[in-house]
Amino acid sequence: MLAKRIIPCLDVDNGRVVKGVQFLDIRDAGDPVEVARRYNEQGADEITFLDITATHHGRDTTYRTVERMAETVFVPLTVGGGVRKVEDIRALLNAGADKVSINSAAVFNPEFVQEASQHFGAQCIVVAIDAKKTGDNKWEIFTHGGRKPTGIDAIEWAVKMADYGAGELLITSMDADGTKAGYDIALMRAINDRVTIPTIASGGVGNLQHLADGILQGGADAVLAASIFHFGQYTIPEAKQYLAEQGIEMRL
């Protein structure tokens, strides 16, 4: 059995972390490189960097930030946000990203995922799925940060993306996100019952048991969280220890 992974997530706008970070020993909590360095030292298995900068001009800042991060951090780095074409992926990989996350662009052009996977290999292509519950065991894909409904069934979409060459799925419940009430376990379970590629649970973590639930009940291969780590509520080692005590294989 492969060890499960803990992935802190940074939301970055114009080269600055936007969901506040409270580490006592960080000089500049707004600098994503400082924050990533801290998580690297704590033993994060991977780090995810979501660029929410809308502007074209902001992309250059992003590439520079990724370059600086890759020099500082020695765990796999996934970068997402605004990835629309093969050139974007190439630029991020060249800057030092290990994996690239594709979200809205996959919805508008599913063949892009096939093309990306063939070009660079499935191992570095993550498809991010933002899903909202619309009924009993039914979820719909939303784009534009969860604002735009697409009418696409999230479970069928996950299967399609796996078929199209995604190496991994990052599954965020728009309902759970920010609630601190735990992942949408039913959503994770429904997708994991249908796909064989690794999945990452995202959205809703408020405590360490939620991380365990994502793995033990949801079937996730990795668990992503932001605020519980950013605000110093828990450290990565505490989270790993807790999961290991639940019988989950971790890299301690």
UniProtKB/Swiss-Prot annotation:
The active site is at residues 11, 130. Gene3D superfamilies: Aldolase class I. One of its GO terms (biological process) is L-histidine biosynthetic process. Pfam families: His_biosynth (PF00977). It is found in: Cytoplasm. One of its GO terms (cellular component) is cytoplasm. Its main location: cytoplasm. It catalyses: 5-[(5-phospho-1-deoxy-D-ribulos-1-ylimino)methylamino]-1-(5-phospho-beta-D-ribosyl)imidazole-4-carboxamide + L-glutamine = D-erythro-1-(imidazol-4-yl)glycerol 3-phosphate + 5-amino-1-(5-phospho-beta-D-ribosyl)imidazole-4-carboxamide + L-glutamate + H(+). It is an enzyme of class 4 (lyase). CDD domains: HisF. Keywords: Amino-acid biosynthesis, Cytoplasm, Histidine biosynthesis, Lyase. Its EC number is 4.3.2.10. GO terms for molecular function: imidazoleglycerol-phosphate synthase activity; lyase activity. Pathway: Amino-acid biosynthesis; L-histidine biosynthesis; L-histidine from 5-phospho-alpha-D-ribose 1-diphosphate: step 5/9. InterPro entries: Aldolase_TIM (IPR013785), His_biosynth (IPR006062), HisF (IPR004651), IGPS_HisA/HisF (IPR050064), RibuloseP-bd_barrel (IPR011060). Belongs to the HisA/HisF family. IGPS catalyzes the conversion of PRFAR and glutamine to IGP, AICAR and glutamate. The HisF subunit catalyzes the cyclization activity that produces IGP and AICAR from PRFAR using the ammonia provided by the HisH subunit. Heterodimer of HisH and HisF. This is Imidazole glycerol phosphate synthase subunit HisF.
